Amino acid sequence: MRIGNEYAAKTLCKAVQACYNFSVYTEDGTNETTGRSYMENKLIRSKYFLYLTEFFAGMSVMAVELGASRLMAPYFSSSQIVWTVIIGVIMIAMAIGNVWGGKLADKSATPDKLYRRLIIAAIWIALIPFVGRYLIAGISLLLALFVTKNFLVWAALAACLVIFAFPCVLLGTVTPSLTRFTVDNLDDTGKTVGRLNALNTIGSIIGTFVPTFVTIPAVGTAATFLIFSGVLAAIGIAYFVFEKKKSVPGIVSVLLIAGLCFALPSYSFAFWQSDITLEDESIYNYLQVQDDAKRTTLSTNVLFGVQSVQVKGDALTGMYYDYALAAPCMAGMDGTDNENRSVMILGMGSGTYASYCTRYFPGASVQGAEIDKKIADIAKDYFGLPGSVTVAVEDGRAYLAASKEKFDVIMVDAYQDITIPFQLSSVEFFNEVQAHLKPNGVMVVNLNMTSAENGSINEYLCDTMAS
C-alpha cells in the first residue's frame, strides 16, 4: 500500500511539473525530469552571470536601506534613532535570509528557485513607495492607541519590519545559493567565496552612493525604488529567458513596474493633502512648500509641522520666531542707519529671518549659510528672499571655521528635522561663534521648545553655552 502511495505521489508531481513547467532538482543539482545537472547550464557554468547576480543583490540591499530612510523620514524624521531601527531590521532580515538560503541551497540546488526569489523581491521593492506610505500611516495610527512611551521607536520598528524585512530576507538567500553554484572544488573555495563577497560589497558601495547623490535628488525616492527593483527583475528574467523557461513572477514584475512608472507623476508622500505648492527631494531632505492667501510655509522631513513661516504682506508671523528680531536691537542696531552692521544666519532655511532683518534694519549686511542648495533656491523662488542677502551653500559650522569675518548678530537656526544637530550644540561650536562676534555682539539660538523642568534640554544647552 505504501509503495502504491509513493508511486501515485510521484506520478502526480510529474503531472504538475509538466503542466506548469516546474523543474525539480535532486541534492546533486540534477533535474529529475530531464536528467540534466544545473552545471550543464552554460549561464551557470561560466559563473559571470552568478557574479553579476551577487553584485546587483548587494547593490539592491543598500538601495533599499537608503530608500527606507527617505520613505520614513517624513513620518518619523531621519534621526539617529530611526537610522538605528532601519539598519537593525535590515541586518536581522539579511541574517535570517543567510541561514534560510543556506538550507535551501543544500536541500535543493537549483538556480530556478533563486532567481524566482529575486523576481519576487523585485516586485515587493517596486510596491514599497506606493503601498508603504499607507502602511506607515496605518501602523502609526494603530500604535497610537496602545503605545504611550517611545512611540517613535515602536512605530518606526513596526513599519520597518512590515515593509522592508521580507525583501531583505529574500536577498539574504542570494550569497549562500550562489556559493553552492560557484564552488567547483575545495581547492578554490576560499577564492570563489572571497570574490562573491567582494562583488557584494562593491555592489553595496554603489548602492549607497547612487541613490543618495544621483537618483533621489534627480527623480525622487519612489523612482529610485522602481529603478533598483527593475534591475533585480531584469537579472531574474534574463536567467529564465536564457534557459527558455516560463516565469509567471517575471511577467508580473514587468507589467507591475511598467504600470507603476506611469503612476510616478502623480506620486506624493502626503497623499492626504491636495494643496501642496511644491513637493521635492534633495540630497538632505524631503521638501514641501504650501502657499495660501495668508502665508507660505516650508516643511522638511516632517509632514505634521513646519520649519519656516512667512506671512503675506509686511506683517510678522505672530509666533515665537519674531522674538529673534530683538537680537539686532540688543547689538545696537536700529531702524535707520546700520552701515557696517552685519547679521549671520546659520541654517538660513527659507530666509524668513533674513528678510525681516533687511526690512527692519536697513543698510545692514545680511548673510546666511544653508547646507541644502534646494532650500536656498526655494527661499528665492517661493519666499521672495531679497537679492541683497548673500547665501553660502555649506554647513554652518564649516562656514564659520573658514571665515575670518565678525558679525554683530549670529543667529543659530540649523535643524535636522525636529532636532538640533549635535555639532551645533557643543562647547567647541559656541566658542567658534563667540570668536566671530564683534564686541557687544549677540548670539541668538532657536531652541524650538520650552520646559521649566529640571534636567530639560533647555537647561543643558544653556549650561553648555555658559561654559
Task: Outline where the language-model segments fall.
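Short, conserved active-site loop motifs that form the nucleotide-linked donor/cofactor pocket
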Residues: 388-390
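Class I SAM-dependent methyltransferase Rossmann-like catalytic core
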Residues: 308-324
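Conserved phosphate-coordination/catalytic loops
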Residues: 63, 314-319, 394, 423-427
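Short, surface-exposed charged micro-motifs
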Residues: 286-288
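Alpha-helical transmembrane segments of multi-pass membrane proteins
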Residues: 16-280, 291-294, 302-307, 329-342, ...
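Short linear segments in intrinsically disordered or otherwise low-structure-confidence regions
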Residues: 3-4, 10
